[in-house]
Amino acid sequence: MSTNLLRLILLFITLSITSSLSTPSPADSPPYLWPLPAEFSFGNETLSVDPTVTLIVAGNGGGSLIIRAAFDRYMGIIFKHASGRGSLLSRIRFLKMVEYDITSLKIVVHSDSEELQLGVDESYTLMVSKKNEQSIVGAATIEANTVYGALRGLETFSQLCAFDYITKSVQIYKAPWYIQDKPRFGYRGLLIDTSRHYLPIDVIKQIIESMSFAKLNVLHWHIVDEQSFPLETPTYPNLWKGAYSRWERYTVEDASEIVRFAKMRGINVMAEVDVPGHAESWGTGYPDLWPSLSCREPLDVTKNFTFDVISGILADMRKIFPFELFHLGGDEVNTDCWKNTTHVKEWLQGRNFTTKDAYKYFVLRAQQIAISKNWTPVNWEETFSSFGKDLDPRTVIQNWLVSDICQKAVAKGFRCIFSNQGYWYLDHLDVPWEEVYNTEPLNGIEDPSLQKLVIGGEVCMWGETADTSVVLQTIWPRAAAAAERMWSTREAVSKGNITLTALPRLHYFRCLLNNRGVPAAPVDNFYARRPPLGPGSCYAQ
């Protein structure tokens, strides 16, 4: 067990003795950081932070607009109270030369590249100390190889800062701090589903913003499904006739803005177009995509037009989504009506195909379309289970149904994303945070070379029973449990009693989300997203 983790456990034991008497006070409790950094040390000092703290940048990437925008964003979070940054009181304090321990934040970024792809370096070092004989001015310093590592460091810095209601100032407890941090997995995702229920642009942005607080880095956008097709596709403009209404749609500009907004927070957007099943809505605008009026999905495998439409959709989407991964679905394909539709049945017989052969033909042809547009295909696990040896070797398999699929996929040389429905499907409201937290993506995979093929994991917010009114409180705080599992070291999340090492911090993180305007539900809910049963502190629900 690491020294840092042991120190935390001892501190949490102390906290648990007094937690029934009062709510946590940052000054009297261990560091409430989420997710837990890889390596860190801290002391016992309390430092004050100047509300006019200045940004100092250095390195090839220090001048990035991403850094400047993030600094301004986080200063608004840290100094949001009336006596905070930009307020009259802060200006008076400045004029009176009130002395603060932390007066500047230095951000050093070594690379000037802002390319955001799978595996981008998100490591950072954060140092916070007061002025002393060697330092005339107190400072905090974040050093990172990329702007995206600096973003993660800014989030950690913001979590160290707490507003003191007595002194009406922002303070950092347990200083000095030295943190060296990096993620365990390069892919840490959250799926949203805008087909089952339309989510307005501002709600999607709020989800993305909240993801950045937990250091998640991939938004898996399940844009379309059998119920609705809300996205504008200029090459085939009738497709979005499959939207629920004229007002529940996304323009090309909307989608581009979501991608831009996400990139500013170090988050990739992976789009999904699920084929050949889950596609009934396509035929609202183009009925020829249906095998027949009584067989509306899977899509018609016999027609070149079907694949022309897929190619057109992907060509349009390639202009919007720069991320190297593109999800082609391929799950839950019921082919019964293919064999009961005359022209499809004749097509199958002419090629000596079974319906399973036709399913494989469809998936592989769709993969080649995606690859031709410089995308790496991602498919749900049924494609691997049904015809894994025929999939393109570049395919990333996403697990959802069978617990050992990642074990089997990596053994065959495929990369895998873990998102087992029993634990990481957020629409399963009866799964408590403990089960989410304790679920390990690498279980059963002992070979380090195969472990590397599990690129990460994803919690899935399927939309059948979640719309704008409840989506954020269904996501949070349970998504945070998976976020720490994917970011922090395996040792840190697997050792000790999580009611001591994780629960107090998760309570605090839930309240942090609430304070930042995210309606995260109580941690100790028997059913997710249920409101509190009675009065009480945010830190004890």
Swiss-Prot record:
Reactions catalysed, as given in the entry: Hydrolysis of terminal non-reducing N-acetyl-D-hexosamine residues in N-acetyl-beta-D-hexosaminides
Consequence of gene disruption: Reduced amounts of paucimannosidic N-glycans-containing glycoproteins in roots and, to a lower extent, in leaves.
PTM statement from Swiss-Prot or TrEMBL: N-glycosylated.
Keywords per UniProt: Disulfide bond, Glycoprotein, Glycosidase, Hydrolase, Signal, Vacuole
Gene Ontology annotations of biological process type: carbohydrate metabolic process
A GO cellular component annotation in the UniProt record: vacuole
Glycosylation, residue list: N44, N304, N340, N352, N497
Compartments, as annotated in UniProt: Vacuole
Broad class of where this protein is predominantly found: other
Transmembrane residue ranges: none
Pfam families, alphabetized: Glyco_hydro_20, Glycohydro_20b2
pH dependence remark: Optimum pH is 4-5.
Coiled-coil stretches: none
EC number: 3.2.1.52
GO molecular function: beta-N-acetylhexosaminidase activity; hexosaminidase activity
Residues spanning the signal sequence: 1-20
Expressed in which tissues: Expressed in roots, leaves, stems, flowers and siliques.
Keyword Phosphoprotein: no
Residue pairs linked by disulfide bridges in the UniProt entry: C295-C337, C511-C538
Active site: E332 (proton donor)
Activity modulation notes: Inhibited by N-acetylcastanospermine, 2-acet-amido-1,2-dideoxynojirimycin and PUGNAc.
Similarity-based family: Belongs to the glycosyl hydrolase 20 family.
Function text: Has a broad substrate specificity. Can use synthetic substrates such as pyridylaminated chitotriose, pyridylaminated chitobiose, p-nitrophenyl-beta-N-acetylglucosaminide, p-nitrophenyl-2-acetamido-2-deoxy-beta-D-glucopyranoside (pNP-GlcNAc), p-nitrophenyl-2-acetamido-2-deoxy-beta-D-galactopyranoside (pNP-GalNAc), 4-methylumbelliferyl-2-acetamido-2-deoxy-beta-D-glucopyranoside (MU-GlcNAc), and 4-methylumbelliferyl-6-sulfo-2-acetamido-2-deoxy-beta-D-glucopyranoside (MU-GlcNAc-6SO(4)) as substrates.
Protein name per the record: Beta-hexosaminidase 1
